Amino acid sequence: MRELLPFLLLLFTLTVFSQKEANFWYFGRNAALDFNTGTPTPANGSKLNTLEGCSSFSNENGELIFYIGAPSAIARNLTIWNSNDEPMPNGIGLKGDSSSSQSALTVPAPGQPNIYYVFTVGARSSNNAGFWYYTIDMTKEDGLGDVVAGPVALGDPSNHSEWTEKVTAVRAKECNAFWVISSYADKFYAYKVNTAGVSLDKVSTINGYNTIDPRGYLKVSPDGKKLVAANMESGTHIFNFN
């Protein structure tokens, strides 16, 4: 991530996972949509109640396995609910914040079909900014899942109070790995997720770039060559990613 390019805002479609793993969308105040028939239909039972960041994940057959967010506008720490709309064991009061822009990101563990990593980012406004990850094992609780590890602090914990609300992922050049990316000030932190787990970070410093406001979004182009950072108050920038 070396070159800073001035550019207009572009929206990229992030094709990280197979199509059916995004067949359920859980968002907002108890809202959910099922895309399995090709036409979005309401899904009932959501316990989610959030104005901003949230996440949901389905299996390769398009069946919901869990979703992530907050149960109310007051309780901003994250909860992970299973497909029965019940909190997972160890899945209540997690690090992160439902008021952060990108809040939670799920990445399937390569080579371990029942393991998922959930990456979370907090928010400065509630004094819980930072970057962490948790591990979910879907073989637990009769297939409904359990949060078996975490929180693991990522980035530089000494700078967590100034961490941004941005996190994204893209498939690596080798098909059985992913890159997970977040940022702080003038630095981008990239973590390779492969069969060995979550690797140590690779840090890139961008001269002349700084995030004044933590809010915004990170996205990677589908070919994995460009990273776009849309920042509140400090514009939108595109970088080479390799």
PLM segments and residue spans:
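Bacterial Sec-dependent N-terminal signal peptides
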Residues: 1-24
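Asp-box/WD-like beta-propeller blade repeats and closely related beta-sheet repeat scaffolds
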Residues: 123-183, 194, 205-209
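Structural signature of eukaryotic scaffold interfaces centered on beta-propeller domains
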Residues: 19, 49-63, 95-114, 157-177, ...
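Residue-level marker of positions within ordered structural domains that often coincide
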Residues: 6, 10, 61, 138, ...
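Hydrophobic core segments of beta-strands in well-ordered, beta-rich domains
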Residues: 24-28, 58, 65-69, 112-124, ...
